[in-house]
């Protein structure tokens, strides 16, 4: 089963221009869905993505990518 990344295009923390290519690099076969994730509170303060329906958040995009990579390895 392919991994799924879900990111918000409404929240201020995630920068989709830089985040999306990095997610594709982590898993080129993953499904990426863009839209409101109803995660507004944390999404204003931290960059985040949902990985296979689980939220992953970090203060920086680099930390987020590291956390997502770990999540994918443990799967």
Swiss-Prot record:
Pfam families: DUF1450 (PF07293). InterPro entries: DUF1450, UPF0741. Signal peptide: none annotated. Belongs to the UPF0741 family. This is UPF0741 protein GTNG_3358. The lineage of its organism: Bacteria, Bacillati, Bacillota, Bacilli, Bacillales.
């Amino acid at each position: 089963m392919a991994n799924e990344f879900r990111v918000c295009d409404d929240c201020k923390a995630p920068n989709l221009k830089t985040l999306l290519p990095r997610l594709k690099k982590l898993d080129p076969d993953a499904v990426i869905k863009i839209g409101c994730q109803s995660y507004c509170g944390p999404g204003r303060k931290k960059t985040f993505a949902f990985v296979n329906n689980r939220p992953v958040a970090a203060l920086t995009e680099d930390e987020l990518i590291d956390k997502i990579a770990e999540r994918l390895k443990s799967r």
